[in-house]
Design a protein with these regions (language model features):
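Short, charged low-complexity intrinsically disordered segments located at boundaries
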Residues: 44-46, 114-115, 189
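A broad, low-specificity signal for short, low-complexity segments enriched in glycine/proline
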Residues: 54-56, 101, 188
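An N-terminal amphipathic alpha-helical segment
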Residues: 95-138
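Glycine-rich, often proline-containing surface loops adjacent to acidic residues and nearby aromatics
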Residues: 58-64, 132-143
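Long, contiguous N-terminal structural blocks used for assembly/anchoring
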Residues: 1-97
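Acidic, proline/glycine-rich low-complexity IDRs
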Residues: 138-189
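Short linear motifs at secondary-structure transitions and domain/linker junctions
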Residues: 67-70, 112-118, 154-157
């Protein structure tokens, strides 16, 4: 019974993280949570769709209540402004992409079109989930050649400067940019 309760809590937390990340449309969100119910709670697979809908609604209501206490400008909004500015400097930003292969595919596509970007910044849904609860978003940064950014690179310094300009503290550590930011993405009231 304790394992069942832990599994249910795990799926509920997954639903909460997905809702707060805001990376999926309604249908994809429901499908992800339904699949998690089916996989983690197989004895409740026959009601997986209903449980997914209920737990998503519960997570959305919790988010609506929480966002009332957020400041006027959240870290998420500052991140979006910073990412828009970074993109103006020919650095693509992939938010919530599947993995490094998505960044590689983007760079290959742009290179094939003769428009290799200066770089690409990317992070996965798991990185967003970490920022939802822990207040740190880890961002990968590659040059347009797929080479990792490194200390002393103008690309890295420029991206760090843009983040700082938008009120975000960031540092390069172990191959990634660590941004002190809570992913507080608002949903409609």
């Amino acid at each position: 019974m304790a394992d069942q309760a832990r599994s249910e809590q795990h799926v509920r937390e997954f639903a909460r993280a997905c809702v707060r990340a805001g990376l999926l449309d309604d249908a994809a969100l429901h499908d992800e949570v339904r699949q998690a119910v089916t996989a983690d709670l197989p004895d409740r697979a026959d009601v997986a769709g209903e449980l997914a809908a209920a737990w998503i609604d519960e997570a959305r209501e919790e988010l609506r209540v929480d966002q009332e206490s957020w400041p006027e400008a959240t870290d998420y909004e500052r991140l979006q402004s910073a990412f828009a500015e970074v993109e103006l400097a020919d650095v693509e930003v992939l938010q919530g992409c599947d993995d490094h292969w998505a960044a590689k595919a983007l760079l290959d596509e742009r290179a094939g079109a003769g428009t290799t970007p200066r770089g690409v910044a990317w992070f996965t849904p798991a990185d967003v989930w970490h920022a939802v609860d822990e207040g740190m978003l880890e961002v990968n940064l590659w040059h347009g050649t797929t080479a990792n950014a490194a200390p002393g690179d103008a690309l890295l310094e420029d991206v760090l400067g843009v983040l700082e300009k938008h009120g975000l503290t960031a540092r390069f550590d172990e191959g990634r940019i660590e941004v002190d930011a809570h992913w507080h993405k608002r949903i409609a009231p």
